[in-house]
Amino acid sequence: NSYSELLTAAIDKEAAKKQAFDEVRKNFSDFLAKRKKNQPFFYSFNPTNTHRTWVQGSGKALWNLNPDDLKGKMPPVVPDVPEIREDMADYLGEVMAFDAACAALVTMLQEMGELDNTIIVISGDHGIPGFPRGKCNVHDFGSAVPLAIRWPKKILPQRIVKVPVSLIDLAPTFLAAAGLESPDDPDGQNLLPALSQGGDDAKLRGWALIGRERHAGAARVEHNAYPVRAIRTPDFLYVKNFKPDRWPMGDPYKVTDTSEPTFAELVKNTYAAFPDMDMSPTKAWLVNHRKDAGMEKFIDYAWGKRPEEELYDLTKDPHQTKNLATNSSYSTTLTKLRDQLMSELKNKKDPRLENDAFDRAPYHTKDQRK
C-alpha cells in the first residue's frame, strides 16, 4: 500500500522498494507459519495502492512510463491532454507495483513447491478512480476489471472467456474446486465447466449484473444514494438509473456558475465537488476547464445527469458513448434486457425494488451538512 508515496519520500529508493516487497513476503510467511503440513489454505492479498491517492508524476519517475506515449490512446470519455495522460500513467505505475508484488508471492509458492498445487486468481475490483466513467460507474470503464485464473492440469492455458462473468462467481467456483456443493440458488455461477478441458462459453450464463447505491457517504446533502442497476451481455449494456433527477457523481457543492474550488483543493479533497468521483488531477482539470470550448461532452460523461434508461450496442460502440435507449431500431433489445434485469432483481429480492428500501434505515441516515 502507498507504494508511490513510500518510494517518493525515500532517500534510498532501492531500499524503500525492498522494504515494500519484504513486507508483502513477510505477511505471507507469517500466514503460512500457522499452516499445518499439507493443510489447504486460502490467502487473500488486497493492496490498496491503485486507489487514490498516488504521487503525481510517479509513473514516469518510478516506472519510466512516459505520459506522452499515451497520446492518442486515451479512452474517448476523457480529454487527451497532458495532465490527464500523466494521471493515467501514474495509475498504471501503481498497477505495475501490484504486479510486482504478485510476482513476489508466486515466487514464494514456487520455492515452496506449491505453485502447481495452488489456484491463483488475480482480479481488480473496479475501474480507475477519479476518472469519468471510472470507479462508481456501471459502464465498462468503471466495472470491467481483469480476471485471470491459473490452475495447472485443471484449467486450459490461455483459455479466454468471451462472455461477461462476475467476481461473485468466484465463491461457487472455489467451492466446486474443493469438491463442495454451493447453497441453493447461489448468486454466482461455477466457472470451472467453462475453464476445464472441453469447456466453452455456452456453459455459462452469458451475462452479468452490475449495480451501485452509494460511494462517498455525504456525496449528496441528505446522504441519498444514486441507485443504478445494469445487465451486461456480450453485445449490449442496459442501464437503469432509478433516480435520474440526482447527480450521478454527487452534488456539485463548491462548483457553481461563478465559482469553483482550486486545482489543489480538488486534488486533495474528494468532498470539494462531486464526491462520488475520487479526488484526482483529472477531476481537478475537468472542473477548472469545464467551460472551455469542446468540453461539454466530457463534462457530461464525468458528472452530467443521466436519463432513466441507457442502452449501448457494444459491437458498434465499445466505449459506450451513444445511448440508444430512445432509438426505435433497438426497442426490442431494450424491452428484452429491461425485462431480464427486472426479473433477476425481483428474484433476488433487491431492496431497491421494495419501495426504495435503500433510502430508509438501516441503509440510510440523514446527513447533518448544511
Predicted regions and their residues:
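Active-site-proximal cap/lid insertion segments
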Residues: K13-A16, F31-P186, N190, G199, ...
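Acidic, His- and aromatic-enriched active-site or binding-groove loops in soluble protein domains
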Residues: S2-L32, P67-D69, W207-I210
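Short Pro/Gly-enriched beta-strand edge/turn motifs at strand-loop
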Residues: P129-F131, A208-R214
